[in-house]
């Protein structure tokens, strides 16, 4: 159980001034928060850990050489290009 003194002490540590009404409000809120921790204490801990809720399947394919665009074709629709390369905006000055 959280006491009013605990609330005032916490407020003092935080360097804030609170009224009696605020202290009572915070006391109730602190108790609610601590109740949530009590609920967490009841969670089973001896379960096998999972990394994902849904099963994941990697989809791999073999690398196969194929036809690719010529440089001129790849750059043909580029709005900004320079010396045979795509030109993007500067990100570091």
Curated annotation (Swiss-Prot):
Keyword vocabulary terms for this entry: ATP-binding, Ligase, Nucleotide-binding, Protein biosynthesis
InterPro entries (alphabetical): Asp/Glu-ADT_sf_sub_c, GatC
EC category name: ligase
Documented EC number(s): 6.3.5.-
SUPFAM superfamilies given in the database record: Glu-tRNAGln amidotransferase C subunit (SSF141000)
Record-level Gene Ontology MF annotations: asparaginyl-tRNA synthase (glutamine-hydrolyzing) activity; ATP binding; glutaminyl-tRNA synthase (glutamine-hydrolyzing) activity
Superkingdom, natural source: Archaea
Assembly notes: Heterotrimer of A, B and C subunits.
Family assignment from sequence similarity: Belongs to the GatC family.
Protein function: Allows the formation of correctly charged Asn-tRNA(Asn) or Gln-tRNA(Gln) through the transamidation of misacylated Asp-tRNA(Asn) or Glu-tRNA(Gln) in organisms which lack either or both of asparaginyl-tRNA or glutaminyl-tRNA synthetases. The reaction takes place in the presence of glutamine and ATP through an activated phospho-Asp-tRNA(Asn) or phospho-Glu-tRNA(Gln).
Name recorded for this polypeptide: Glutamyl-tRNA(Gln) amidotransferase subunit C
């Amino acid at each position: 159980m959280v006491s009013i003194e605990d609330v005032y002490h916490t407020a003092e540590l935080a360097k804030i001034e609170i009224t009696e009404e605020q202290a009572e409000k915070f006391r109730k809120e602190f108790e609610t928060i601590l109740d949530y921790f009590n609920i967490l204490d009841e969670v089973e801990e001896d379960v096998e850990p999972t990394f994902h809720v849904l099963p994941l399947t990697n989809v791999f394919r073999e690398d196969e050489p194929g036809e690719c665009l010529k440089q001129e074709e790849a750059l043909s629709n580029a709005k900004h290009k320079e010396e045979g390369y795509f030109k993007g905006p500067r990100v570091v000055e």
